[in-house]
Regions:
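Metal- or metallocofactor-binding catalytic centers and their adjacent structured scaffolds
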Residues: 5, 33-34, 39-110, 313
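Conserved, mostly hydrophobic/aromatic
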Residues: 31, 37, 98, 111, ...
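N-terminal small/glycine-rich loop or linker at the start of catalytic domains
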Residues: 109-134, 167-178
Length: 339
């Protein structure tokens, strides 16, 4: 087997501003897995300010995987190839690239979309949310107006960056009463601030508040003190978080989970606690978004997923198969990942 790796740097159309800082560009690793006349494609999308994973670490891991995979023939089962890579270097963001390539290859060999390999009765389309960053009131309201006009049924607003009450009010006024409003603090608040802010903002009609604070113990306390639903994102990385029944919902990401297989396993753990699952990207490229759509379809998610993010990247043409229509992305119909 031959693993080919290409690294590119992509700039954001406008810098990504959240409570953890401003990011102007991201590294993306595209991989091709060659063997048996079929090429599987995948990607690794580390975002160090968010996940703490340096691009250099991913590059090193992928180089080791490439060297390792040369020793395997094309008829070796995919799970054994992935296990071998994991044994060499267990770095989820790098493993995700191999996992995606293996699923893409399997789908192409079977002539079926990945979602169909995972589940016969998968969703045909996955609900997605629009995301509004740390814009001022006028900018946030304008973005909300565009999102509502485009048919999004859910909008996520980044908070914890100042003037939250004014921005939330402006966005709700622009959206009207029927579009769900989700807030994401990226852990910017402490417990007391989170409780105070959530209670103050709740009259705007909140679907849920994502990652109001960091850490299982802190999230548990906030959830116990507010009526609004609370979800975790970054805290999902904390040991034991997925089984702690600490939140009403958990946001899972392809890269952080090590690919589709890892994400499905983690989703099962979360659902066993009674919590909901939804997916989001870390500003992934087209292959990462496609993989997440297939996984979300197989999971039959109800909550809108944060996968409408390709438009934030300069130089990336959104594939027709991944275009957002009326707040949903249809499952790509082509074999494999379908893009």
């Amino acid at each position: 087997m031959e693993l080919r790796v290409e690294r590119t740097t992509l700039r954001f159309r406008t810098p990504l501003r959240t409570s953890y800082g401003e990011v102007a560009a991201r590294d993306l690793f595209s991989v091709e897995l060659h063997g048996g006349g079929v090429v599987g494609r995948g990607e690794a999308a580390p975002l160090e300010p968010y996940d703490g994973v340096p691009a250099a670490a991913v590059a090193e891991a992928l180089a080791l995987y490439a060297e390792l995979l040369r020793g395997f023939s094309a008829d070796v089962p995919g799970h054994l190839l992935l296990d071998a890579c994991r044994t060499a270097v267990e770095l989820p963001e790098a493993l995700a690239a191999v996992d995606l390539a293996l699923w893409d290859r399997a789908g192409k060999r079977a002539g079926r979309p990945v979602a169909a390999l995972l589940r016969d009765d998968h969703l045909d389309a996955v609900p997605v949310n629009a995301t509004i960053g740390a814009l001022n009131r006028a900018g946030a309201a304008a973005a909300a107006t565009l999102a509502a006009a485009a048919g999004y049924a859910c909008v996520k607003l980044k908070v914890g960056t100042g003037d939250d009450a004014g921005r939330v009010a402006a966005v709700r006024a622009a959206l009207g009463p029927t579009v769900a409003l989700r807030l994401d603090a990226n852990g910017a608040w402490d417990v007391e601030t989170a409780v105070r802010m959530i209670e103050a903002l709740a009259p705007a009609g909140l679907e849920l508040v994502e990652e109001p604070v960091h850490g299982v113990a802190a999230v548990r306390e906030v959830r116990a003190r507010v009526a609004t639903r609370v979800s975790i994102d970054e805290t999902a990385d904390e040991p034991g978080a997925l089984t702690a029944a600490v939140a009403d919902a958990v946001c899972l990401k392809i890269g952080r989970c090590g690919g589709i297989g890892g994400l499905l396993s983690q989703a099962a753990l979360v659902r066993a606690t009674g919590a909901d699952v939804y997916l989001a990207s870390t500003m992934d490229g087209p292959l990462g978004i496609a993989a997440a759509v297939h996984a979300a379809a197989a999971l039959r998610v109800d909550l809108a997923c944060g996968l409408a993010t390709l438009g934030h990247l300069e130089g990336v043409v959104v594939p027709e198969a991944l275009r957002v229509v009326d707040g949903t992305i249809r499952v790509p119909e082509g074999p494999g990942l379908g893009v």
